[in-house]
C-alpha cells in the first residue's frame, strides 16, 4: 500500500511539474551579480539593476516575442555594459563591469502567483567585479521584474509546493 502511494505521489509530482512548465511561454531573464556581500556592493547591484531595467524597457519593450527580445539584447549587450559602467563610475566604483548574453542556470523563483521553475534560460547577465556576492534576477520577457523592497526587507519567505497546488486544484482548495 505504501509503495502504491509513493508511486502515485511521484507520478503526481512529475505530471504537475511538467504541466506547470508547459504553461510558461519562452522567457528571457536578467541576472545581476554583485561583487561581494558588503552593503556597498549590494547597493551598487540594485543601482545597476535599475539601469538594466530602464535600458531593457527601451530595448525590448515592444518585442513581439521572446526570440525577438533576446536578439535585441544580444544586439545591445555592449550598450547595457556601457550604461552600467557609467553609472558605477558615477557612484565611485572603479572595478570591472561585464555584460553578456547566453544560457544560464536559474533556481526556482516565485513572482507573485507565477512559479518560474529552475532551469537553463536565455538571459542578460551583468557581473560586477568578481561576481561573488548575492545576485538579483527577474524575467525581462514577458516582464515579471517586480521590485518590492518592502517584501524584501521583511525577510518573509513564501514556500510553494507543486504537489500541494495540484491537490488544491483537484480537491477545490480544502487544504
Regions found by a protein language model. Give the residues of each.
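Early exported N-terminus immediately downstream of N-terminal targeting peptides
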Residues: 26-74
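Soluble extracytoplasmic domains of inner/organellar membrane proteins
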Residues: 114-166
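Hydrophobic membrane-insertion alpha-helices, especially the h-region
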Residues: 3-20
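Extended, compositionally biased alpha-helical segments that mediate assembly or anchoring
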Residues: 174-175
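Mid-length scaffold segments of soluble, non-membrane domains
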Residues: 70-123, 127, 131-133
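Solvent-exposed coil/turn segments that connect beta secondary-structure elements
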Residues: 33-37, 102-104, 129-131, 141-144
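Sec/Tat-exported extracytoplasmic proteins
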Residues: 36, 52-63, 77-95, 171
Amino acid at each position: 500500500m505504501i509503495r502504491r502511494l509513493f508511486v502515485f505521489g511521484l507520478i503526481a509530482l512529475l505530471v504537475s511539474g511538467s504541466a506547470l512548465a508547459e504553461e510558461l511561454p519562452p522567457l528571457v531573464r536578467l541576472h545581476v551579480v554583485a561583487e561581494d556581500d558588503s552593503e556597498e556592493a549590494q547597493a551598487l547591484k540594485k543601482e545597476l539593476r535599475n539601469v538594466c531595467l530602464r535600458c531593457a524597457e527601451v530595448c525590448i519593450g515592444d518585442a513581439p516575442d521572446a526570440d525577438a527580445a533576446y536578439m535585441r539584447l544580444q544586439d545591445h549587450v555592449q550598450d547595457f555594459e556601457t550604461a552600467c559602467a557609467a553609472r558605477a563610475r558615477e557612484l565611485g566604483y572603479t572595478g570591472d563591469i561585464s555584460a553578456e548574453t547566453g544560457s544560464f542556470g536559474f533556481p526556482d523563483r516565485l513572482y507573485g502567483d507565477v512559479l518560474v521553475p529552475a532551469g537553463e534560460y536565455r538571459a542578460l547577465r551583468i557581473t560586477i567585479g568578481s561576481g561573488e556576492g548575492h545576485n538579483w534576477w527577474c524575467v525581462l520577457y514577458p516582464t515579471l521584474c517586480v521590485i518590492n523592497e518592502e517584501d524584501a526587507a521583511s525577510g518573509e519567505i513564501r514556500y510553494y509546493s507543486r504537489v500541494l497546488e495540484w491537490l488544491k486544484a483537484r480537491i477545490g482548495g480544502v487544504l
